Design a protein with these regions (language model features):
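Sequence/fold signature of self-assembling virion shell proteins
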Residues: 64-104, 110-115, 121-173
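Long, hydrophobic/aromatic-enriched structural stretches that serve as scaffold segments
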Residues: 1-26
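Residue-level detector of short, conserved catalytic/binding motifs and their immediate flanks
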Residues: 6, 29, 114
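Core alpha/beta catalytic barrel or barrel-like domain that forms the active/cofactor pocket
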Residues: 3-6, 45, 110
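Flexible, active-site-adjacent loop/turn segments at secondary-structure boundaries
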Residues: 2, 13, 53, 61, ...
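Alpha-helical scaffold segments that mediate packing/assembly in large oligomeric complexes
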Residues: 18-26, 33-97, 152
Length: 173
């Protein structure tokens, strides 16, 4: 656990001039905003540090890595071998990869994606990919398989505390 605290002080002059009601209310609102902001920044830190090798998990690897070691030997990846911008192909590949994730004994665990998490810069791309009934960016009349198959039943959410403009994440069940 981590204790986070912030406070404000009112001067004796403010008390004598009966300014404590007005100042106290304003400062209290500012403290509440500051705490809400801090909670969001700390919550987003897991994703913001997901590719940083300075922040490792129990296996000695960052959260998103191409070489998580398996107890039975071998490795497992939960990020693409080659970085890819968010588009139909990269999203389909990510969903396929998720469906073939394995446990520490290298057995498929049959995960499904439930929600995509994107920074503000990708919200329009995410909306087109998940809400269109037809394929995005083609003149063909093909269905949007991601939408049609309900591959991300909870849709997407925009996290305003993700500074990387092209990183996207998929929450699983």
């Amino acid at each position: 656990h981590e204790t986070i605290s912030l406070a404000f002080a009112l001067t004796e002059e403010a008390m004598e001039d009966n300014l404590y009601d007005r100042l106290g209310a304003r400062y209290t609102r500012a403290l509440a905003r500051s705490m809400a902001h801090t909670k969001q920044v700390k919550a987003a830190a897991t994703l913001n540090n997901a590719f940083d090798s300075s922040f490792t998990g129990g296996d000695g690897k960052e959260l998103c890595a191409t070489d998580h070691p398996l107890a039975g030997g071998g490795t497992f990846r939960n990020e693409p071998s080659t970085a890819a911008d968010l588009n139909e192909t990269s999203l389909e590949n990510a969903l396929i990869d998720i469906s073939t994730f394995v446990d520490e004994r290298n057995m498929i665990i049959a995960l499904r994606g439930t929600k995509m998490i994107v920074p503000p810069q990708l919200q329009f791309v995410a909306d087109r990919l998940l809400e269109s009934t037809l394929r995005v960016g083609t003149a063909d009349n093909d269905i949007n398989a991601i939408n049609n198959m309900g591959m991300l039943p909870d849709g997407y959410t925009v996290n305003h505390f993700l500074p990387d403009p092209d990183a996207f994440f998929i929450k699983t069940d």
